[in-house]
Amino acid sequence: MSSDPLQQVCDLIKGDLSLERVRDIKEQLLKEKSVVEYQLNKESDKYYGEVEESLKLLNLSKNSVTSIKQQINEVNKLGNDNRFAINRYDILFRATKLYETVNTTSSIYDRIYNFVALMEHIERLLVAELAEDALETGCPHLLEIHFLLTSARDFQEQVVVMAKEATEDAQRTVMKLFSRLSGIISKFDKLLDGLTYDIVEMARAEQISLAIRLFKIYDLEEREDLRIEAIRNIIKKKEIEIEKSSIKKLPNSKNTARLQDETPKVIEYPTNKGLYQEIMSGTISTRTAPRGYKHFLINGINNSISEMFGEMREKYVGDQKFDVLDNMDWIFNELIIVKEHIANCCPPHWNIFEVYFDQYYKELHSLITDLVESEPETIIILDILAFDKTFQDTLKQDFGFTKSEVKSVIGDKEKETLFKDYLNLIVVKMTEWIGNLEKAEFDVFLERSTPPHSDSDGLLFLDGTKTCFQMFTQQVEVAAGTNQAKILVGVVERFSDLLTKRQKNWISKISEEIKKQINYNHKYDIDPESITPEDECPGGLVEYLIAVSNDQMKAADYAVAISSKYGKLVSKVYEKQITNHLEGTLDGFAEVAQCSSLGLITLMFDDLRKPYQEIFSKTWYMGSQAQQIADTLDEYLLDIKPQMNSVLFVNFIDNVIGETIIKFLTALSFEHSFKNKNNKFLEAMKRDFEIFYQLFVKVLDGNESKDTLITQNFTVMEFFMDLSCEPIDSILDIWQKYLEVYWDSRIDLLVGILKCRKDVSSSERKKIVQQATEMLHEYRRNMEANGVDREPTLMRRFVLEFEKQ
C-alpha cells in the first residue's frame, strides 16, 4: 500500500472510533471502491475496444501488404515476359535510358537558367506579403509562394545530391547557384511563423480562408515528409542488404582485415549514392529529406501561447501579481475559438484542440504554481482554488470534458498542499483572533466594572460569543464561496477545535473566580480586616455567570444554524463531517452553561452555610432555619429568573431543588439525635418541606415541568422520613423500595439516619448497614446482569463527611 492510502486511512480513523464511525468509514470506503471499480471497468472497456480496432487494422494492413506483393510479382513477371519477347530489348532499353538522361539534363539546364528569375519573383511576393497585415489582406499569394518555393527547394535538394556524385568544381558551382535560397526560405518561415501566431485571430477576423490555406500547406508538408521518410527507409534497407551481401562474398582474409580495422568507417544510410540512383530512376521526384514543418507548426503554436503568457506575467507584477486571477477569461475564449472554428480547418488526426489545450494548461499550471510558491494570503489561496474549480467546471460544461479527463490546473498534490496551507493560515489567524477575543472578554469577566448587557427580553449577555461567531460565520462564508467542500469542512473542523479550547478556558476561569469569591466570603465572615488586596473580589459575579450561561445557548443556536445552512451545500459525506464537528461543540457549550449554573448554586448555598449547620439541632425543632433558607433562595431566584434563558432556568431550578435537599440531608453528618417524642421530628420535617415546596411552586408557577421537577426531587424526603420514623424492623423493606428509585445512591444516607436515631443501638446499626449494603450491591448486580441502563438520580452525589473519616 502506498503512503497516500495509508495517510488517507490515518485521517479517516483519527478521533472518535465509535461503532457508528467505523460503519461510516466502511460505507465511505465501499463507495470509493465502487467508484474506482467503475472507472477501471470503463477504462478497460475503452482500451479493449481500441486494441480490438487496432488488431482489425493490423489484419487489414497485412492483407494489403500481401496484395501489393502479389501485384508487384505480377508486374515483375509481365516485365520479364516482355523483355524476352522483344528482339534486341537491351539496345532499346539503353536507348530509352539515354533519351531520359538527355531529357533530364535539358530540363535541369532550363531550370538552372531560369532559377535566378524564379528566386527574384518569390522574393518579391514574400516582401509584399511581409509588408502587409495578413489579417486584413488575407495573404493572397500564400499558396503561390509555397508552390514555387517548394519546387525550388525540391530542385535544389536533387541537384545537390547529383553534385556530390560529380566533381568538386561542380559542387562549388551548385553551392553558388543556390546561395540565395536559404535567405528566401528564412523569409518564408518568418511569414509562416507570423501566420501561425495569428491562427486564432484569423477566426476572429473572419479570415477562415487564410486559416484553411495555411493548414493546407502544413498538411501537404506533413504528407510529403511522410512520403520521403518512407522512401529513405526503403533505400536504407536496400543498401544495408546489399552491404551485407557484399561482405559475405569477400574472401575471409579481407573480412578479417575489416574486423581488425581500428577505425571502421561509419556509413549513414541512405547514402548519397542511393539517393542519386533513385533520383535518376524517377523514384524521388520532389524533396530528398523531411523538412519538419509539422513540428514548425506545433512549435509556433506553443511559442505564441508562451509569448502571450509572458506578456501577461510582465503586466501583473509586484503587488498586482495576484490580480491575474481575475483576468483569465481570455484563455477560455481562445480555446472556444480553437474548438469551434480552427479545429474545422485542419485535418482531424492533428487533434489541434489538444495541441492548444496542452500548451495552455502547461503555461497556466506554471503560472499558478508560481503564485502558490509566492506564499499568498488566505484570500488569495481561496481565489486560486476558486479559479481551479471554475477551470474544471468550464472544461466539463463548455468543452465536453468527462470527469476522468478533467485535471486540476494546480495539480492534485499541489492542491492538497494548498488546502493544508490555507487551513494552517486560517488556524493561525483564527487562533490569534480568538486569543485576542478571549483576553478581552476574560478581562471584562474578571474586572466586572460594568454590568452585563441586556437584550430586548431582559436576558443578560456578553459581547464575546456574538463576536466569536461573527468571525466564524465570515470564514465559513468565504470557504463556502470557493465551492470546495474540503475547504469548508476544514474551516469548520479547525474553528470547532478553537471553540472547544475556548470552552475549556471558560470553565477554568469560572471555576477560579468562584473559588476566589468563596474564599473572599469566608475571610470576610471571619475577619473583614484580614482581607488583602489579592483577596479582593469585584461584585457582580452572579450576573456575569447568568450572562455566560445565556451566551452558551446563543452559541449553540449559532452552531446549529451554521451546520444546517452550510451542510446543505456539500455532499452527504461532507455534511455529516460538518454536523459531527459542530455537534461536538454543543456538548462543550452545555458544559460551560452547566459550570456557570453550578457556580451560581455554589455561591447561593455558600450564603446558607449557617442555617444548614443548625438543621436537626435542638434549635431546629422550634427554629426558622428552613424559612431563612427559603427567603434567601427566593431572593436569588427572583433576580435570576427574568435574566436567565427560560430553558436554562428550568435546568437551573432543578439543580437548586436538588441542592436544597442534598444540603438538608448533609446535616446528618453532625449526628444530632432525632427527637421523635410526640412526633416533634416528623412535624418539623413536614413544616420545613412545606416551606420549600411552596417556594418552588411559586418560582415554577406557569411552568409545564413544575410537578415533575418538584415530585422527582421531593420523593427522597418521603423515604427519608420513613427511614427516620418507622419501626426498626421495617427499615430494610423501606430501603429496598428506596433502591428501586435511587439505584445509584451510597449507603451514607442510611448510616447517617441510623446514627441519629436514638432507638437504634450500635450493634443493630452495624447489622442493618451490612444487610443494606448487600442489598445495594445485589440490586446493582441484577441491573448489570439484565442490561438495565437508567438515568442518574439526585442521590448519586450525596456523601456524608464522616464517611471520609
From Swiss-Prot:
Pfam families: Sec6. The keyword Acetylation applies. The modification N-acetylserine is found at S2. InterPro entries: EXOC3/Sec6, EXOC3/Sec6_C. Disulfide bonds: none annotated. Signal peptide: none annotated. It is found in: Cytoplasm. GO terms for cellular component: cellular bud neck; cellular bud tip; exocyst; mating projection tip; prospore membrane. Keywords: Acetylation, Cytoplasm, Exocytosis, Protein transport, Transport. PANTHER family: EXOCYST COMPLEX COMPONENT 3, EXOCYST COMPLEX COMPONENT SEC6-RELATED. Belongs to the SEC6 family. Present with 1080 molecules/cell in log phase SD medium. This is Exocyst complex component SEC6. The gene is SEC6.
